[in-house]
Amino acid sequence: YAVDESGTDDDALAAFRYEGIDKPLTRINAVATGGKAPCNIFQTKNLIYTANYTGGSITEFRLADDGSIKKANKVMTFSLTGKAPDKTRQQSAHLHCVTADHYEWRAFACDLGNDCIYSLKPNATCDGLEVDSTLYVAAGSGPRHLTFDDEGRYAYLITELSGEVMGFSHH
């Protein structure tokens, strides 16, 4: 899977078939993200998500058995909630990354514009995600990417604006 950031309303998530090292990738299909500037992909067994930087959204798609992408199932849009210190870079929500913990019990999304990480959990019908809580980090830090250690006990955040690596315990 790859994002296709054309800079128009046609920004998309594309599916490709891989048939071996000596064969070219075959494009299966592409589906509009409903969000601008998709920049990150996270996949579970039958769902795939894009983090869309411009406009601050996450798009959720269902996957077909053949690996193709079905029409966007849900777009979660986030708003600027406060006054971020960097008026140029933090004028709106900017989702950079969506990922999950070691067990895929929760997803996490990094928002550069709001200086926070959203914790997302399955909704009541288990057919999508909803925000469970929000962890705010230092104002002006600009969260970019989050990853977990191999055992899922610790999370590490890279910030874009302050250039830091932050560590968190995860239970």
PLM regions with names:
Residues F16-K23, F61-K70, L120-G128, F168-H171:
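Short loop/turn segments immediately following beta-strands, especially the blade-tip
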